[in-house]
């Protein structure tokens, strides 16, 4: 039996239903599962001395585009809004292949892990003609090499520019091709068991790049296969105009008409829902992945998170792709979310601790998982720890629950543990030679961008 003990943590912030915070306590994991939290001494061979540390549940990222890690900070797109931004970047993304996917995934997930992330959902929807094979497989290989909990998606686009959509022909597929590979991906990789390290959702890209038929058939197939549904929705006013002009409906009304609503569905962004639509999301348990930094960079708007939380809409936190973020740091996202809503909503804004819960138990809920997101006996041993005995955090531990929102910590964290195994130690990835990986990735970026 593999056992790991976090010993003598100054605080353990559990994010459990009672908002419990343990002080001067130990946390024991056995075969990847938490079996004890409390002050009593525990004996085991592998021990992390957590003296001075605050231990938190592992952060859960609910929307990403890992392939975009190799197209960040490009000067030609820095001042564009979504539609023009996408049109410019499709000309780069059409050159994706499995090698780029693997190394960009290692780079992006490695950054996330160094900053306390333990579960990542990735929305991969670009499958270039002639290079579509093996892309999702490369992501799972990268996740396995890093030792991370991976929730991938088989994304898709079939509505090209010639058919009235946004993407060029070079990055779209037929409905039949897409549905066949969706089924293959689920049958090959989706593990629905408790503490699963590999899961798959179906995730057509957006209403402006996917046909009505593909959206409808994807919803039917996902429910036949018992997997979840995800897409972008209500991200910009341009999208709203597109759907109104093409379909005669608002975006949520259109998606609901195709079966895209319910507790097995979550949308990325969700900025431009009206009040009635927010109530509909709450009634149906439909979730939203909040991506504040991306929304700010692309001038998309501010998601109505305070109202969502008040109504009971499930909300998770996400970094979005590195071409619109331009990074993979969920700790930074957490603090930005806190500050953005303080600016926008004052006393109605979520507290620093509320935002931590959005990034943990909230994110777990919209991914349909009750085995991760909080530190409780019987849940997965996914956590991270920050040593507060440093100049930057003097006095910050007076409110450990809110620290990550109010004071903030950009990382790297001192420890990240996934499934009861240490994946980051003293701020360094355990399963990766970071310097070598960075050199290889940098060389590949230059090659990829010159294609």
What is the role of each PLM region?
Residues 12-24, 37, 298-299, 305, ...:
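Acidic, glycine-enriched loop/beta-strand segments at the rims
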Residues 1-43, 53-54:
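N-terminal metal-binding scaffold of metallo-dependent hydrolase/deaminase domains
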Residues 130-270:
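Metal-coordinating catalytic core of metallo-dependent amide/deamination hydrolases
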Residues 70-101, 159-175, 196, 237-264, ...:
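Active-site gating loops and adjacent loop-to-helix segments of metal-dependent hydrolytic enzymes
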Residues 15, 380-438:
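C-terminal cap of metal-dependent C-N hydrolases
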Residues 257-264, 306-390, 406-408:
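His/Asp/Glu-enriched, well-ordered alpha-helical/loop segment
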Residues 28, 72-149, 180-194, 442-450:
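Alpha-helical scaffold segments that flank or form the walls of functional sites
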């Amino acid at each position: 039996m593999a056992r790991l003990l976090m010993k003598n943590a100054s605080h353990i912030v559990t994010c459990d239903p009672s908002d419990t915070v343990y002080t001067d306590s130990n946390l024991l994991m056995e075969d990847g599962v938490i079996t004890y939290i409390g002050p009593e001494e525990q004996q085991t061979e592998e021990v992390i001395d957590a003296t001075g540390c605050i231990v938190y549940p592992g952060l859960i990222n609910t929307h990403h585009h890992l392939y975009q890690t190799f197209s960040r900070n490009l000067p030609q797109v820095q001042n564009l809004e979504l539609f023009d931004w996408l049109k410019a970047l499709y000309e780069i993304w059409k050159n994706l292949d499995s090698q780029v996917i693997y190394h960009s995934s290692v780079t992006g997930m490695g950054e996330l892990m160094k900053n306390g992330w333990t579960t990542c959902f990735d929305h991969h929807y670009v499958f270039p003609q002639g290079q579509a094979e093996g892309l999702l497989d490369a992501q799972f290989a990268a996740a396995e090499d890093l030792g991370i909990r991976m929730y991938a998606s088989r994304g898709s686009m079939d509505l090209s520019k010639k058919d009235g959509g946004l993407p060029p022909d070079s990055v779209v597929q037929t409905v039949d091709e897409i549905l066949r590979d969706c089924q293959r991906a689920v049958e090959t990789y989706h593990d629905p068991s408790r503490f699963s390290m590999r899961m798959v959702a179906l995730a057509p890209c957006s209403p402006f790049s996917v046909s009505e038929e593909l959206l409808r058939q994807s919803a039917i197939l996902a429910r036949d296969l018992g997997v979840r549904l995800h897409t972008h929705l209500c991200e910009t006013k341009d999208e709203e105009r597109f759907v109104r002009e093409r379909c005669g409906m608002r975006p949520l009304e259109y998606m609901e008409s195709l079966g895209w609503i319910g507790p097995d569905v979550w949308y990325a962004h969700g900025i431009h829902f009206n009040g009635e639509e927010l109530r509909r999301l709450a009634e149906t348990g439909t979730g939203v992945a909040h991506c504040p930094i991306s929304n700010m960079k692309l001038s998309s708007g501010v998601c109505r998170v305070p109202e969502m939380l008040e109504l009971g809409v499930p909300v998770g936190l996400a970094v979005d792709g590195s071409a619109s973020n331009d990074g993979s740091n969920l700790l930074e996202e957490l603090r930005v979310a806190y500050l953005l809503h303080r600016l926008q909503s004052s006393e109605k804004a979520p507290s620093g601790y509320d935002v931590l819960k959005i990034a943990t138990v909230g994110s777990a809920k919209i991914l349909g998982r009750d085995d991760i997101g909080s530190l409780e006996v019987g849940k997965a041993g996914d956590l991270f720890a920050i040593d507060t005995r440093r100049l930057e955090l003097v006095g910050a531990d007076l409110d450990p629950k809110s620290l990550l929102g109010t004071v903030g910590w950009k990382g790297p964290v001192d420890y990240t543990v996934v499934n009861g195994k240490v994946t980051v130690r003293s701020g360094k990835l355990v399963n990766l030679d970071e310097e070598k990986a960075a050199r290889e990735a940098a060389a590949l970026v230059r090659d990829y961008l010159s294609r």
